[in-house]
């Protein structure tokens, strides 16, 4: 709702803006003033309900169809599962979703928790994407190996508890809570159920990313992908731009010293599926 108010005012000309103000009560005008003050401090507020806009307009990157499905699903659904092939950019898009979640909520009200099968995966797969994204944008704060802090506030962190340590997730809560499970195929049933218990109240979201099971059948991730509780978005190699012919846009994440190239360079291609 805040985003809609802001967008209507910011996109209007002075005459239209005056007409809008004329229809408002003094209390509503005060509310608009507070929103505009907030916008000055955080221009990303207009993307509260528009994660695609945040990524494409706010930070200037391209998205292809399946990526848009994922980010909109996190906006609209409490639980999203993405069983995907190798190298479709799962961790890349997860980092953008995390950035959107933190950027559009007031500091201190939102938190992101990430986990994976091992701490090595937490540290080396998803968090480098988060670190690079924060560094190249004006999202603010400092990102260490597995923590993102803004003005001293811990807004996101990664961890990997023991398979049977369901108590490790106790006490995790925030008005706006996003939990991201990378390499979800290896997560234990005990931890999976514990993470799902965090979805019981408030504005909470759970995003699972992983490869379809091969030798680890009947895993918690596989059950989630077969559950009506989840919005499931499968991504096969032939769903990605190098096979569909869809434009993936120009890569904006590599250093400026790297020659301009398509995002498709980083995605699964024919050499992977031969």
Q: What is the role of each PLM region?
A:
Residues 1-274:
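Phosphate/NTP-binding elements of NTP-utilizing enzymes
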């Amino acid at each position: 709702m805040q985003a809609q108010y802001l967008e209507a005012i910011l996109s209007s000309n002075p005459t239209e803006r005056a007409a809008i103000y004329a229809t408002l009560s003094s209390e509503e005008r005060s509310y608009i003033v507070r929103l505009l003050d907030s916008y000055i401090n955080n221009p990303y507020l207009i993307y509260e309900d528009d994660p695609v806009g945040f990524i494409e307009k706010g930070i200037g990157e391209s998205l292809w169809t399946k990526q848009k499905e994922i980010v909109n699903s996190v906006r609209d659904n409490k639980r999203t599962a993405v069983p995907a092939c190798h190298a479709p950019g799962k961790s890349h898009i997860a980092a953008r979703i995390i950035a959107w979640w933190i950027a559009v909520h007031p500091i201190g009200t939102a938190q992101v928790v990430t986990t994976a099968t091992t701490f090595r995966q937490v540290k080396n797969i998803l968090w480098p994407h988060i670190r690079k994204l924060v560094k190249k944008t004006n999202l603010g704060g400092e990102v260490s190996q597995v923590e993102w802090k803004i003005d001293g506030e811990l807004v996101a962190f990664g961890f990997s508890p023991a398979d049977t340590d369901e108590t490790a997730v106790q006490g995790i809560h925030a008005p706006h809570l996003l939990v991201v499970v990378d390499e979800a195929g290896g997560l234990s049933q005990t931890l999976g159920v514990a993470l799902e218990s965090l979805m019981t109240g408030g504005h909470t979201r759970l995003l699972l990313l992983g490869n379809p099971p091969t030798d680890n059948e009947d895993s918690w991730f596989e059950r989630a992908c077969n559950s009506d509780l989840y919005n499931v978005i499968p991504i096969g190699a032939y769903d990605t731009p190098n096979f569909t012919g869809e434009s993936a846009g120009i890569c904006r994440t590599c250093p400026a010293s790297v020659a301009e190239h398509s995002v498709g360079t980083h995605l699964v291609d024919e050499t992977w599926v031969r």
